[in-house]
Regions:
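Membrane-proximal intracellular helices of multi-pass ion channels
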Residues: 1-287
Length: 287
């Protein structure tokens, strides 16, 4: 329950949620997805502002992505070795688990076809809604970036046109749009550097890529050597330190962790410490 509510994904069995009944798996899947919703939607529902809750663009996009990803994977993996009901359950569970960064698993999705794994990687990048317990880049940021791309394309086609980017019916200022662009650039830079450092260990591309992806977005399992049936225990010390940083940076939305390494912060901290020591010595001499 706690692992689902906090989208933390901690289990007490080696088989994760795969060791429980189909009923339990459906319950966990539903609540994982619900905890990935922007909590403002629940506030609107409690206040009986149903139109605002159901008109939230991010929430609609979130459920649309889950539905589309589940449908694509179902079509790709369905065969006669498993019933349609079981296939749907496992697909919805894994899509919900990775979309919300919970990280539970009912099957070894590393054995799924390549197309299904690509879909899972995409939703691992996107993540849950802003204002939820989930990780990832967040659906709202992805929507804003897509709208920014659309506006730039329209500007090329109609140079004199002026178009505002709106979210939830409200126009966004340029500062908000720029902050999202900066976040994407920062995410890409940290991802690239981490990927390079982890790749020094010499493992395969899939392991290195998904190890960085799953830790930066706080997903849990990746693919190949860090897949759902394996763990990160075999990685080198360097890789583990890099991935530890990625986990913290991803959970804190990148910038708080980067600020810790800014020279100005250390300079001010050092100078502040020196001032306090001087004042302490001065008081001791006066006494």
């Amino acid at each position: 329950t706690f692992g689902t509510a906090g989208t933390g994904g901690f289990g007490v069995r080696n088989t994760s949620i795969g060791g429980y009944s189909a009923y339990i798996q459906w319950v966990v899947a539903i609540f994982m997805i619900l905890f990935g919703v922007n909590f403002n939607a629940y506030y609107f529902l409690l206040m009986k502002r149903f139109k605002q809750a159901f008109d939230m663009e991010e929430v609609k996009g979130y459920f649309l992505i889950i539905a589309a990803a589940s449908a694509l994977i179902f079509i790709n993996i369905y065969n006669k070795t498993m019933t349609a009901a079981d296939t749907i359950r496992h697909v919805v569970f894994q899509v919900g688990s990775l979309m919300t960064s919970t990280g539970y698993s009912t099957v070894d999705f590393d054995l799924w076809p390549s197309a299904s794994k690509v879909v899972l990687i995409i939703i691992m990048f996107i993540g849950a809604c802003a204002g939820s317990t989930g990780g990832g880049i967040k659906v709202s940021r992805v929507i804003m970036m897509l709208k920014s791309v659309k506006r730039e394309l329209n500007a090329y086609l109609h140079p004199k046109s002026v178009r505002m980017i709106k979210m939830e019916g409200k126009a966004l200022d340029q500062g908000a749009i720029s902050s999202v662009a900066v976040y994407f650039i920062t995410f890409t830079l940290i991802f690239a550097v981490s990927f390079l450092l982890v790749a020094l260990e010499g493992r395969d591309l899939t392991t290195n890529f998904t190890a960085v992806l799953t830790t930066m977005n706080n997903m849990g399992p990746g693919l190949a050597d860090v897949g759902p049936s394996k763990n990160f225990g075999g990685l080198s010390i360097l890789s583990k330190y890099v991935l530890m940083f990625d986990m913290l940076a991803g959970r804190l939305e990148l910038f708080p962790m980067l600020v810790l390494f800014h020279p100005v912060l250390w300079k001010e901290t050092w100078e502040g410490g020196k001032r306090r020591r001087r004042l302490k010595r001065k008081k001791s001499l006066e006494n």
